[in-house]
C-alpha cells in the first residue's frame, strides 16, 4: 500500500532513527505529492562516448570491464543554468539531487514525471525498485525517445518516488552482508557494476575449466551448472 503525503512526512520526522525516512535536501514543499515525492536531477552525468565496443562480457576480469566502462562513458558536471542536451535516441546516466535512506519497513518505486514523459524522456530503463535499507543517491537511466533534443537542468523535478509499506520489516536489508548490494552509499552518478555480481566467479571458474579441457560439456550443461550454482550459494 502506498504511503500518503501525511505518512511520508510522519516518517521523515520520526523520532526513532531506525524508522526514519531520510530525504535531503528538501528544497520545496511542492515536492510532496498526494502519494509520492518529486525528485530533482543533480549536476553530474555520464554520457556515452562515440566509440566502437564489440561487447560487454561479464566473464572477463573486473579490471578489463572497468577499463571498458570508463572508455564507454564520459563523466561531465553541468553548471547551473547550462544543462545537458539529450539528443533523440541518446542514452545517459544521471542521479538524484537528493540523498535517500529507506528504513526496514519501507520500499520505494521510482517513476518518471508525466510532464517529461510526454516529450519522450525516459528516466529509468529497469532500475525502478528501491529495497528497504538503501542509502544513497539514485541513478537515473535517461533516454530521449522523442525526435527533438531535450535540455536537462540541474534541480529540475524529473522523477517521483512512491513509497510502499512492507507488512513485516525486512530481515536482510539492502547493503547487508551477503545481500549482493552493488550501489549502497553511492553519492554520484554510478555506472553499471554488473561485474561485481557474486555469482559471476562461479561461471568464470567453469569457463576456465572448460577452456582448459577439464570440464566436460554434456547436453544438459545448463541444468547441471544451475544445480551446482544452487548448491554453492544455498
Description of each model-found segment:
Residues 1-234:
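DUTPase catalytic domain/fold
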